[in-house]
A protein has these predicted regions:
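Active-site donor-binding loop signature of nucleotide-sugar glycosyltransferases
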Residues: 58-62, 91, 162, 211, ...
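Conserved glycine-rich beta-strand-loop-beta hairpin in the small C-terminal domain of fold type I
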Residues: 211-214, 218, 230-245, 256-271, ...
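Hydrophobic residues at beta-strand termini and immediately following loops
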Residues: 12, 58-60, 160, 294, ...
Length: 329
C-alpha cells in the first residue's frame, strides 16, 4: 500500500453506514450490483430495497476454492447490458466464513481489470468487516483492497472497515471508508472530491459519528497491549473453528448436509440434503430444541461457531442432525 495513491479514511457510523453511503453516492435504481450467491442479507436491504438496484450473482465456490472465473464471466455478462456496476467483495465472507488464497485474489484482480478493459466502469467495495480473523495460513492475509487500488481508470476501489469485529468493539458504531481511484490523472483531486461528497452525505444523514466511541477506538489502537489482546481473542475463535471442522469431519452427518469450505470469520454454512427446507428446519430447531441458527437460502443453514464454547460444538451439530431427521422422516 505504500506506493498506492489513496484517499484519507473517513469515519462512518460503522460498516453498515458505509454501505449506505456507497449506495447513495454510486447506485441509481436498476443499476447492477454483483455479489456471490452467498451474501449478507443486509446487502439486499441496503442496495436492493433502499437503492433499488438489480442484484446479479455468481457461484462463490469452484472446486473448493473461490470462483474467480465465475466472477469474471458475470462481469462480462453485466457489461453487455450496463456501462457500470458495483462489485462487492466480502472476505472473510458472511455467511460462509471463506477467504480466498493470495493466488485467487490475483485472479479476482485480473477478472475486474479484464471487465474494465472491456469498458465496464466498476465501483468495487471491499467489505472488510471480519478482516484479520483468518484461521489458516493459506488465507489471503491482507485486504483485497490493496490488489485493486489504482488498478485501472475504470475501477474505483472502496475499503470499508468496522471496529465491531476487527477490534471486538460491539456497539461502538465506528468504521472507516477509504477511496482508491485508478488512472493517470490527479488522483489526489479525485479523492478530495469524493471525500467532500462523502462528508456531505454523512452531514446530511446522521450529522456525525459518535465522538465518544471514536475516542475509545483511538485509545485502544494506541494501547501497547491491544495487539496481544486481539490475538488472544482471535486464537479463541480459531480454536472454535478448528473444533467445528473436527466435528463435521465425522461421517455421521454426510446424509444430512454438505459442508461449505470455511477458514475464517465468525460463521460457516452447510447445504442441506433430503429436500429439507432450511427455514423450516431453523424454526423447528428453535421451537423444539431451543437452538438458533440462520437460514441463508432454501438449502443453506448458517451456524455461528464464534459464539460456541468448544465443548458445545458437537452438541449443537448433533441436535441439528436430530432436527433434520425429524423433518426428513
Amino acid at each position: 500500500m505504500r506506493d498506492k495513491a489513496l484517499g484519507m479514511p473517513i469515519v462512518t457510523s460503522a460498516l453498515t453506514h458505509g454501505l449506505g453511503i456507497v449506495g447513495d453516492l454510486f447506485i441509481n435504481p436498476g443499476d447492477p450490483v454483483v455479489l456471490p450467491e452467498h451474501f449478507w442479507g443486509n446487502y439486499n436491504l441496503t442496495f436492493g430495497v433502499r437503492n433499488q438496484c438489480e442484484i446479479e450473482t455468481y457461484p462463490l465456490y469452484c472446486e473448493g476454492g473461490f470462483n474467480s472465473s465465475g466472477l469474471g464471466q458475470k462481469l462480462l455478462e453485466v457489461g453487455e447490458k450496463s456501462s457500470k456496476a458495483v462489485v462487492v467483495l466480502n472476505f472473510p465472507n458472511n455467511p460462509t466464513g471463506y477467504t480466498p488464497t493470495a493466488e485467487a485474489a490475483a485472479e479476482i484482480r485480473e477478472a475486474i481489470v479484464a471487465a474494465a478493459e472491456a469498458g465496464l466502469r466498476q465501483v468495487v467495495v471491499c467489505d472488510d468487516a471480519y478482516f484479520g480473523l483468518f484461521f489458516e495460513d493459506n488465507c489471503l492475509q491482507e485486504s483485497i483492497f490493496g490488489y485493486l487500488a489504482n488498478c485501472h481508470p475504470n475501477v474505483l476501489a472502496i475499503k470499508l472497515d468496522g471496529a465491531t469485529k476487527e477490534l471486538f468493539s460491539w456497539g461502538f458504531r465506528v468504521g472507516c471508508l477509504s477511496y482508491a481511484a485508478g488512472g493517470s490523472g490527479d488522483l489526489d483531486a479525485v479523492h478530495t472530491a469524493l471525500e467532500k461528497k462523502t462528508m456531505g452525505s454523512i452531514r446530511g444523514g446522521i450529522s456525525n459519528s459518535p465522538n465518544t466511541t471514536q475516542s475509545a477506538v483511538v485509545r485502544l489502537l494506541k494501547n501497547p497491549a491491544a495487539a496481544a489482546q486481539r490475538k488472544e481473542k482471535r486464537d479463541i475463535l480459531c480454536a472454535r473453528a478448528n473444533r467445528t471442522r473436527e466435528v463435521l469431519d465425522n461421517g455421521k452427518f454426510s446424509d444430512a448436509w454438505d459442508v461449505y469450505p470455511f477458514n475464517s470469520g465468525y460463521f460457516m454454512c452447510v447445504k442441506l440434503k433430503g429436500g429439507v427446507d432450511a427455514e423450516e428446519l431453523r424454526v423447528h430447531l428453535l421451537d423444539k430444541y431451543g437452538i438458533g441458527v440462520i437460514s441463508s437460502s432454501s438449502t443453506d443453514i448458517r451456524v455461528a461457531f464464534s459464539c460456541l464454547e468448544e465443548g458445545q460444538v458437537e452438541e449443537v451439530f448433533d441436535t441439528l442432525l436430530e432436527a433434520w431427521t425429524d423433518l426428513a422422516g
